[in-house]
Amino acid sequence: MQKYQIPYNYVIQKMLKNRIKGHDGEKYPVWAWAKCGNSICPKKRKNLNHKQQNKVKITFIKPDNEVLLSDYMAYSCILSGHIVPRTKQEYENFLKSLKSKNIVLDDLKAFVRSQKTNPQTEKEMIKVQKTWHRIFDLKSNVHQACVWHIKADEIQKIEILNDSNYLYGTMNPLRANGTRPDWKKRYLKFLP
C-alpha cells in the first residue's frame, strides 16, 4: 500500500468527504470489483508463472450510500501520476507540456510512489491532481468499488479459488511476453 500512498489517500479522502457510510475508524477501505464488462469481476485467466496462492472470492451486496465507485482504467492513470483526461487531445497536450518542461512520465510516477520529488515535478503534480476527480465519471466498462467493511449479513457467497493454473480477480495478468496490459492506453480509447 505504501508504494501508492498518494493515490490511495486521495480515494480515502474522497470517501470521507462524500460521507460514504460505514466508516468506523478503519485506516483503509476494502477494494472490490463492481463491474467488468458484462460481469462483476474479471474472468479467470491462464496463470503463466503458477505462483498464485489460494484466493477467496466474496460476493456481497452493500447499500449505494456505503460504496464509492471509480473507473478502474482511469484509476490506472493516477497510479502512474498522469492526468485523467476528458479527451485524447487533452492527454496529447499534457504530454507536450511535460516535454516542454523537461519532465518525463517516470518523474510523475516516482512522485506518486513517494520515491523522489523536485519543485518542478511538485508544481506539475498539483495540476495533475486537479483532474483526478474524473476517476468517478465511470467512462469505461470496468468499475471498482471501495467500502469501509463487509458485514457478515451482506455476504451472499464465499468461494475458495485454489486452481494454480488460473489467475482470479486480476486485470493485470503477466503475459507470455512478460508485459502487462496498458490500462491508460485502453482508457484513452473510451475518450473522444
Name each model-derived stretch:
Residues M1-Q2:
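N-terminal ordered "arm"
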Residues Q5-S100:
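ADP-ribosyltransferase catalytic core
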Residues F60-P192:
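Active-site and NAD+-binding cores of ADP-ribose-processing enzymes
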